[in-house]
């Protein structure tokens, strides 16, 4: 199921760095994590949906790259983000 505008707004409010922040790595990773979790639930039910599985792998790769960028730029922000999201890294 796609992310609703309301849910996306909630995520942005929770992870934004400053007012009007929609594109910081923290916000992008949080939105991707929510989408990945939703798609994981979908794939548990629909095991043969390989098209969506490929989309999931692309999202995971994009999130990995954003996390690597954030870790390189600011380790403190990176650690805070993975703790908030509950990612095991």
From Swiss-Prot:
GO terms for biological process: translation. SUPFAM superfamilies: S15/NS1 RNA-binding domain. It comes from the Bacteria. CDD domains: Ribosomal_S15p_S13e. GO terms for molecular function: rRNA binding; structural constituent of ribosome. The keyword Metal-binding does not apply. Disulfide bonds: none annotated. Keywords: Ribonucleoprotein, Ribosomal protein, RNA-binding, rRNA-binding. InterPro entries: Ribosomal_uS15 (IPR000589), Ribosomal_uS15_bac-type (IPR005290), uS15_NS1_RNA-bd_sf (IPR009068). GO terms for cellular component: cytosolic small ribosomal subunit. Part of the 30S ribosomal subunit. Forms a bridge to the 50S subunit in the 70S ribosome, contacting the 23S rRNA. One of the primary rRNA binding proteins, it binds directly to 16S rRNA where it helps nucleate assembly of the platform of the 30S subunit by binding and bridging several RNA helices of the 16S rRNA. Belongs to the universal ribosomal protein uS15 family. This is Small ribosomal subunit protein uS15. The gene is rpsO.
């Amino acid at each position: 199921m796609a992310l609703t505008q309301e849910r996306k707004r909630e995520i942005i409010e929770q992870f934004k760095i400053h007012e009007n922040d929609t594109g910081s790595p923290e916000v992008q990773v949080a939105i991707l994590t929510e989408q990945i979790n939703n798609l994981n639930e979908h794939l548990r039910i629909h095991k043969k949906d390989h098209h969506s599985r490929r989309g999931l792998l692309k999202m995971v790769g994009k999130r990995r790259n954003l996390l690597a960028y954030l870790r390189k730029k600011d380790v403190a922000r990176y650690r805070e983000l993975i703790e908030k999201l509950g990612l095991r890294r």
